[in-house]
């Protein structure tokens, strides 16, 4: 909601409110990319730890990534998506796996 400052005849401060619509921020897909070296169990751990998936959902997404080459982990604002991508890539690097996480605008 926006406010407009107006002064009346007695120089008193009045505020006028208007209905200004703000567009929602753009959403980004966070994606995992398949590789031939990262164990499936590690991918499931990543999905559970960083994307709050239960075991069943994490297994479904992991199998999708494995069979189709990539899979969507979630939709987020740009800053959150960037943070998740960085966290997953760092976690993979620390554990010496080549798993890659990326993002694209939805």
From Swiss-Prot:
Belongs to the ClpS family. Binds to the N-terminal domain of the chaperone ClpA. Involved in the modulation of the specificity of the ClpAP-mediated ATP-dependent protein degradation. One of its GO terms (biological process) is protein catabolic process. InterPro entries: ClpS (IPR022935), ClpS_core (IPR003769), Ribosomal_bL12_C/ClpS-like (IPR014719). Residues 1-23 are annotated as: Disordered. This is ATP-dependent Clp protease adapter protein ClpS.
